[in-house]
Amino acid sequence: MLATSDLWFRYQDEPVLKGLNLDFSLSPVTGLVGANGCGKSTLFMNLSGLLRPQKGAVLWQGKPLDYSKRGLLALRQQVATVFQDPEQQIFYTDIDSDIAFSLRNLGVPEAEITRRVDEALTLVDAQHFRHQPIQCLSHGQKKRVAIAGALVLQARYLLLDEPTAGLDPAGRTQMIAIIRRIVAQGNHVIISSHDIDLIYEISDAVYVLRQGQILMHGAPGEVFACTEAMEHAGLTQPWLVKLHTQLGLPLCKTETEFFHRMQKCAFKEAS
């Protein structure tokens, strides 16, 4: 399990995370939302062991995180982070070499590396551009390479920071499909994003953060339907939730479901 217990973190004398109790093992996809400065990025860095809390703990497998070199190496093979800017974690001009970088550092046999790289590229739908130089790839393609680089570790938890930022509508749809495929393999995904519609559609549970504290937690439909909490957090409701709360239309999880239900209603009225 990956969780936090009374997690506090300060930058100098300024508390950024204030007593957070979170459990990411309960849901396949957990969304983290909040206004800028609420602590999402700092939380991600604590979960990955890049930062160490001054009080409380990050819990891995039910125990406080081991911050020794060996302990952090073990954690990062099971908890992988993909940053908002893929340039931060791409080091080679050759895609296969970049994705295989961490495995070669771990001494994984070449035959196993080849198999894992091939599987990761297939999962992120990158086989058709795997032989292109990385500098020639689009922003969205680089994001997929970065995700593939995390997937080859066979991590059980994947932390995605703004996975749809900078993507066009087609790229956003493709990213959602990739996340669903990752989850279908039995993995957990934690998404930090300002894309409220994404979080609503794909998450099974949502934490709303405000000034380093949990303002609300629960199922996406319940959380985002709470207008008062959304306003207090400085957030807007997903458009599907707005249609429900402001117009009384059925609460749907996806755009496809919404239009299907509207078509059924229109057909009934016409007949």
UniProtKB/Swiss-Prot annotation:
SMART domains: AAA (SM00382). SUPFAM superfamilies: P-loop containing nucleoside triphosphate hydrolases. Pathway: Cofactor biosynthesis; adenosylcobalamin biosynthesis. Its EC number is 7.-.-.-. ATP binds at G34, A35, N36, G37, C38, G39, K40, S41. GO terms for cellular component: ATP-binding cassette (ABC) transporter complex. One of its GO terms (molecular function) is ATP hydrolysis activity. It comes from the Bacteria. Belongs to the ABC transporter superfamily. Cobalt importer (TC 3.A.1.18.1) family. Forms an energy-coupling factor (ECF) transporter complex composed of an ATP-binding protein (A component, CbiO), a transmembrane protein (T component, CbiQ) and 2 possible substrate-capture proteins (S components, CbiM and CbiN) of unknown stoichimetry. This is Cobalt import ATP-binding protein CbiO. It comes from Salmonella paratyphi A (strain ATCC 9150 / SARB42). The gene is cbiO.
